[in-house]
Amino acid sequence: MKKLKILILIILFNLVTFKSIQACDLLSVEIGENASTLGFLSSFEEEDIDPNDSVTIFESQTTAFCQDIDFGSTLVKGYLTMDGIIGAVEIVVQNNRNNRASEQGLLRNFVKANFGDFNINSEEWPGYKIWNIGPKQIFYYYSERENEPTKEGVAVTNEQYYNVLLVNEYEN
């Protein structure tokens, strides 16, 4: 009977762990670690990194990182330093002129539910919000310009590597 209880606990633990592996958990991204530690970046080759650029950006379908959440029309980007280190991971909404993807609010609602509330319709909305959670930074941005697609996304990085999001500003 005791062995059966232990077996059930092991099975439950594995189910919970497997679900969290599939979850879209930005805080689980190991910023500063080798790219091979992150699923959708694990298949890149060293020769894929441009030695002339301080940052190489890899893009993939968001489902490669977030298997259990539908954000609509989005991409996931991995920002790697020239030595193959993860500097940031970003989920970007792919809007067209009518901004249908952002109007659905799928990414915005995910960010609010996981990191905190904000109001993009406020007169004081600066266009972004940053949360410092432990050693990591979550950066959400949303900006509208007339006659242009809305820019919306969320990224995880840290103080040491946040400049990779500025691509040309990163210094090792």
Summary of predicted features, one role per range:
Residues 1:
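Cys/His-rich metal-coordination motifs, chiefly Zn-binding "fingers/knuckles"
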Residues 4-16:
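Sec-dependent N-terminal signal peptides
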Residues 8, 73-75, 126:
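Short beta-strand-initiation
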Residues 14, 69, 82, 121-122:
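Sterically constrained small-residue positions within well-ordered secondary structures
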Residues 15-23:
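Bacterial Sec-dependent signal peptides at the C-terminal "C-region" and cleavage site
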Residues 22-62, 88-172:
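Non-cytosolic coordination micro-motifs
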Residues 61-83:
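Compositionally biased P/S/T/G-rich terminal and signal peptide-adjacent segments
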